[in-house]
């Protein structure tokens, strides 16, 4: 009982450090967006990187993911969820980008016109 009250009576350094790091990451993202001459895509990748770092920081510092007895299971489940979300998003972007021009035809004919040319002689 005395150990539990000693744990809760100390100053929340972990929360203060997490808060300061969150502010620093936000200001870094703002600096990259406003004050650098990088391309838009480079800025986006850097800002998304800062966002993922900040999300992990908030989960670890404020959500107390590793402090329970099954903390490693919670971290593993969260990482698996992030992996699934990243695979779905990047896979969707890859499919959209790779097959964007699949239906486009330079000759002006609608898609599927060349495949159905054997039926063109059956006009009524």
Curated annotation (Swiss-Prot):
The keyword Glycoprotein does not apply. It is a multi-pass membrane protein. Disulfide bonds: none annotated. It comes from the Bacteria. It is an enzyme of class 1 (oxidoreductase). GO terms for molecular function: cytochrome bo3 ubiquinol oxidase activity; oxidoreductase activity, acting on diphenols and related substances as donors, oxygen as acceptor; proton transmembrane transporter activity. GO terms for biological process: aerobic electron transport chain; ATP synthesis coupled electron transport; electron transport coupled proton transport. Its EC number is 1.10.3.-. Keywords: Cell membrane, Membrane, Oxidoreductase, Transmembrane, Transmembrane helix. It catalyses: 2 a quinol + O2 = 2 a quinone + 2 H2O. The keyword Disulfide bond does not apply. The chain crosses the membrane at residues 16-36, 44-64, 78-98. One of its GO terms (cellular component) is cytochrome o ubiquinol oxidase complex. It is found in: Cell membrane. Pfam families: COX4_pro. Catalyzes quinol oxidation with the concomitant reduction of oxygen to water. Major component for energy conversion during vegetative growth. Belongs to the cytochrome c oxidase bacterial subunit 4 family. This is Quinol oxidase subunit 4. It comes from Bacillus subtilis (strain 168). The gene is qoxD.
């Amino acid at each position: 009982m005395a150990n539990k009250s000693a744990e809760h009576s100390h100053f929340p350094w972990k929360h203060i450090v997490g808060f300061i790091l969150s502010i620093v990451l936000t200001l870094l993202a703002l600096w990259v967006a406003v004050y650098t001459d990088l391309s838009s895509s480079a800025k986006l990748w850097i800002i998304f990187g800062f966002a993922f770092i900040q999300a992990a920081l908030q989960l670890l510092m404020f959500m107390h993911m590793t402090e329970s007895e099954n903390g490693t299971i919670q971290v593993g489940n969260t990482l698996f969820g992030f992996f699934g979300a990243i695979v779905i998003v990047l896979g969707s972007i890859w499919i959209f980008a790779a097959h964007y021009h699949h239906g486009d035809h330079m000759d002006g004919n609608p898609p599927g016109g060349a495949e159905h040319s054997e039926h063109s002689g059956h006009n009524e």
